[in-house]
């Protein structure tokens, strides 16, 4: 992020990835810790905040070998905001806290993915309770971000085939046979919707932070 840029002035900047900031359970999230960080940058008159890609990582935790150029890593989801905005039931807060406390003494990619999956399941539990306005915003977002359907289908297929490389998948999926893909989408509506919901919330939270910084 570059704040109030003027080419005739000197600027200072800092490189810090959001995952390195405090907050969240397994790494920094798009929550209050980032807002606090932006406030500190402003107080110190640091104009530029540079960070590494926010995309989902590979099995080794690298964002440079990501399954998507557009998607955001689910690890960054801010649960507190989801609860506050009624996207997750308040009653689930204790459940999330218990899971975090039990599993997150040290950082593990597998555990981080498991908790992201749990958050996705909780979002699905509350989906039918969302207002028409919120569902409409989600649908409009999906229409304006056509990549998210292909990404969601791809990720459900990747899980089906034990996260193997796509070129090792059955022929009908490897070459994106239209009828095979349509059948897959029809039979996997909920898993695909869950991934879309996660990406929508990530994008929504990130844009709020960007606006706050600007």
Locations of the language-model features?
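Acidic/aromatic-lined carbohydrate-recognition and catalytic surfaces
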Residues: 2-214
